[in-house]
């Protein structure tokens, strides 16, 4: 059985140092932890950054300065080998919230002086005792809504702070049985095969039941929201989403892995599609857009029971001609 304890320890040691560091030491910590050719990918407006010092300057130092007493509250932590064909790289996954007192403006979002929780999920590729590559996805519109802004007209699901797994067993610090990870990966792959191209020929709810638990929970991003049960997921997200888009490209992932009952993937982007109908209260544009997505899953028996989703909505809507961060900065606030 292949275990990934050393890679997990490298990431956990990095988190401990990063989370405790003052802003003027973050660059030094990253430089000692990441490789010389380190690549970091994050949601708009950060996009792709190269080098530990640049990541510290552009992302971590401003964020930690904005969130006084910032804490990392992890709900899920696991590791594994990339299951995509021809790739045996090892990745460590962390998901939860970065929480603190919103005391300084960030990305033009004005501070509230109150506690906020920024949902995040991070994939770290580890090799030769260094972090080589990171995909760090975080829900900026969710933070905007916590600060009293309304970046989107409406959403089909419920707006809430995403909880961790129902079983509270998502922190896989100890080694897991390889067979359980294989079962989780098989469930995820079956779902991708069924849903990836929207062409199974089955009624939507019947299609979903092939791979999803009847009482599944879907923790969607701000602008779409959360829902539960196959019937309500079909009504409040999957159905409206499919109806809004056409010309969906094939799915492309950078990494796909599983350990124990947990697994997930990310892409850059995962797929493209044309906005040919109404979506998130916005009209059709006829323009193609990229979907940069992280999906994390919890398996129960052989069905997917929970799904946490991070979508770069700011990037997608910017491709549709709507720069939500710029719009916020140009709007007078009282």
Language model feature labels by segment:
Residues 1-334:
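C-terminal and inter-domain tail/linker signature
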